[in-house]
Amino acid sequence: CRVVVLDACFNGSFHLDDCIADEYIFGQGHTIACIANTVNVLQDKWADRYVGLLGLGMYVGNVARFSGYLESHCIGDPTFAFTPAVKMEEVNDLLASNDPVKWQKYIGENTPSDLRSMAMEKLWQQGRLSSAQLLRIFRTSKSALVRLQALVLLAEARDDNFIEAMKLGVDDS
């Protein structure tokens, strides 16, 4: 296995003598990188939020970068990437961009869910996506991942659209 994600406390504690992530990296296998936690971590977090972007060729280190959790680290080679499953522009260049015109291309329903979720995040952070648009996405998207992303972003808005999404979310499966 090339990449291992360990989502538990202390399994990436590189500062200690015994670290589970080190066993994968320095063991006899072929592991190139581990995403692991150094200390106690929140148990109700979305640790694998953008992990699907690995299938589009995202660097493994970006999983930790975009997780938003200080205790999550990439141990090993953060520049390792799998061959992209689909042809598209270079995803790591795209992730480095804050150009709303580029990101707007990936907001549609036919975009892979993880990439669409990242586009939503980027556009929301730039003020280019309104809570009304997020509610529309929440109502219409066939992807549970995209609906969850819309709900998380709506929670930041804390407005009537978030309240409506919460009501709708009760029956979301």
Positions of PLM-derived features:
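Caspase-like cysteine protease fold
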Residues: 47-129, 136, 145-149
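A short acidic, amphipathic alpha-helical/loop segment
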Residues: 19-24, 133-137, 165
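Long, helix-rich interaction regions
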Residues: 111-115, 139-149, 157-173
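Catalytic cores of nucleophile-dependent amide-cleaving enzymes
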Residues: 1-49, 53
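Conserved positions within tetratricopeptide repeat
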Residues: 64, 132, 163-167
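Active-site proximal loops enriched in glycine and acidic residues that flank catalytic Cys/His/Asp
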Residues: 7-10, 36-39, 67, 78, ...
